């Protein structure tokens, strides 16, 4: 198939979050978004061109090349996982997916060059001298990009990125070509931010920004799609066209074909942040665009390297630091300091029962004594866990039973799904003014306003929240046998107001 597409690489300033850049300095943060996007606007005009092409896609990128990625996961990101091992395995799986997408479209093999993954100690210490891992989830993703970029700029030559497999280090480039920070954000939707068309450039200062081939992604568990999208921007790819850009011509974009504008949200470079696994390829326009940018020398891929099977690390290989089927241990990059694990065979050394680096109930290659604390309680409704003495694994994390009386900094409450809460607390959290619950027979969030009016929403209380004579589950009050005596000692959850008006309407603004 031969494709003839007309596209423009001149992109007007978009409101889309990816190309709005922020700065950690308060004075710069006070500027308008239009001013903050000035760097990207100029950058995009620098790469402006119109290109008409008629080439078979298979001939555009004939030689397989490798793009090496330096990955950092901060403390807010690793909280999604029960262990560093689990986080590492997830990151490897996501990048295998990213590599498949790029190999299919651009003949580019994407590999992890290095990985910085903080330990529980790193995160509990909250070390301020490690900004790359200690950023708050409440900091905007744009601020995180500037902080991450500044850290990378100030760190070259300090070996901040260590090759993930030391015994293969000579086959790795000294530095990754792209750096990605995995983080978490208070925003719920997946999103990312990156510096446009910076591939094969060093991190540098330009117009007050620390600019380079870097990206920040907050998209768990959909990391691979957002990472693929952001790397696309670093390579110089613009967004696919959608109804908005086709209708108001607010920005240049990649059309579906020479005759149809709207790409219908089908591809990786879709500007929306609602990614799905339907977006599993790049559009033909994106493929042709990258080829044109390289051919016309608007971007260079000269830093990419020829693939070497010896240096490629994947899941299912001894030495990647992840214990997988057929392995007893995997010391990864720290085998010299690990007497429990044979790094060449991924088997435990003679006399070893376990690996200290791998399991919480292992000490000096043997099981810790029964009763040794291996996981601290994180809140009044979370049980502490203790080693059994017959296993190196810390028992599964468990919560105290729902309905158990608890106390925290907010006062008395009861346990529900592992948190100390109450119906009144949930009212206070969901409304701007109400701290009183009402209608205790209901397991729908029911809150009383100042004049005594009780509103019932369609939102359920957290599973395990107390209701009259029972506990709430899936919006229903489930009776508990013999509960009357124990419950009678607790304050009534019923709102005794002079006038009780039950509103069955869902008032969205009231709760959100």
Curated annotation (Swiss-Prot):
Phenotypic consequence of residue 230 to A: No effect on sporulation
Gene3D superfamilies named in the record: Collagenase (Catalytic Domain), Disintegrin domain
Post-translational modification: Glycosylated.
A biological process from GO: ascospore wall assembly
Highest taxon of the lineage: Eukaryota
Binding site for Zn(2+): 229, 233, 239
Residue ranges annotated for the Disintegrin domain, each copy included: 315-402
SMART domains given in the database record: DISIN
Pfam family, one: Disintegrin
Cofactor(s) annotated in UniProt: Zn(2+)
Glycosylated residues in this chain: 35, 432
Limits of the Peptidase M12B domain: 65-306
Record has Isomerase as a keyword: no
Identification of the protein by name: Zinc metalloprotease mde10
Species whose genome carries this gene: Schizosaccharomyces pombe (strain 972 / ATCC 24843)
Biological classification of the source: Eukaryota, Fungi, Dikarya, Ascomycota, Taphrinomycotina
Gene: mde10
